[in-house]
Amino acid sequence: MSATQNYGTGRRKTATARVFLRPGTGNISINNRTLDNFFGRETARMVVRQPLELTETVEKFDIYVTVIGGGVSGQAGAIRHGITRALMQYDETLRGALRKAGFVTRDAREVERKKVGLRKARKRPQYSKR
């Protein structure tokens, strides 16, 4: 690995993203596809760009991402987390601003398992008094 590249692993729900930051012009490539091609939803694209816009490094890096697992929002969150970690590896002084925005903390919420005798994780069958 070259010294000019920074790496960050991001996770959200069941998605895992490996993010590589390299000096460049602002291209974001996810699983060898462009950001606009990979995410149909504008909100997902916005989530991915948030740490870059906050730190004003949008045009400074080319970002290469491989992401597996999860759905659209989980993958977007995982990429955001990975970009945040890679930015902190690049410049530790960015940590304060990223922490304040809430990008550093891994969102620990996971899907609750379905229990036996229940319809979903917490939804119970209808109760009949008589």
Curated annotation (Swiss-Prot):
Record-stated family: Belongs to the universal ribosomal protein uS9 family.
One of the record's GO molecular function terms: structural constituent of ribosome
SUPFAM superfamilies per record: Ribosomal protein S5 domain 2-like (SSF54211)
Name of the molecule in the record: Small ribosomal subunit protein uS9
GO biological process assignments: translation
Keywords: Ribonucleoprotein, Ribosomal protein
Species of the source: Pseudomonas fluorescens (strain SBW25)
Keyword presence, Ribosomal protein: yes
PANTHER family: RIBOSOMAL PROTEIN S9, SMALL RIBOSOMAL SUBUNIT PROTEIN US9M
One GO location term (cellular component): cytosolic small ribosomal subunit
A Pfam cross-reference name: Ribosomal_S9
